[in-house]
Amino acid sequence: MMPGPFELIVILVIVLLLFGGKRLKNVGSDLGNAIKGFKKSMQKEPADQINTKDNIVEAKTTKESTK
């Protein structure tokens, strides 16, 4: 069950009263940087996995050829 627009406004007001505008802005920017870093690492990971798989195949081929 999703809260309606009135409930969301009440929650927003309570959060602003508890944390204040400046601290809430800092938390938002920190969260944005964390999400940006996560997306960046997710884009780099598949390339790393491909290189690792190529290295494993190359290592197996080298090991078999030395027998």
Curated annotation (Swiss-Prot):
GO CC aspect terms: TAT protein transport complex
Location relative to the cell: Cell inner membrane
Pfam families per the UniProt record, alphabetical: TatA_B_E (PF02416)
Keywords from the UniProt entry: Cell inner membrane, Cell membrane, Membrane, Protein transport, Translocation, Transmembrane, Transmembrane helix, Transport
Claim: Transferase is one of the keywords in the record: no
Topology term for the membrane: Single-pass membrane protein
GO terms for biological process, alphabetical: protein transport by the Tat complex
Predominant cellular place of this UniProt entry's protein: membrane
Keyword Chloroplast part of the UniProt annotation: no
GO molecular function, one term: protein transmembrane transporter activity
Residues that span the membrane, as ranges: 1-21
Alphabetized InterPro entries for the sequence: TatA/B/E, TatA/E
The family this protein is said to belong to: Belongs to the TatA/E family.
Subunit: The Tat system comprises two distinct complexes: a TatABC complex, containing multiple copies of TatA, TatB and TatC subunits, and a separate TatA complex, containing only TatA subunits. Substrates initially bind to the TatABC complex, which probably triggers association of the separate TatA complex to form the active translocon.
Biological function: Part of the twin-arginine translocation (Tat) system that transports large folded proteins containing a characteristic twin-arginine motif in their signal peptide across membranes. TatA could form the protein-conducting channel of the Tat system.
Name of the protein: Sec-independent protein translocase protein TatA
Organism the protein comes from: Ruthia magnifica subsp. Calyptogena magnifica
Gene this chain is encoded by: tatA
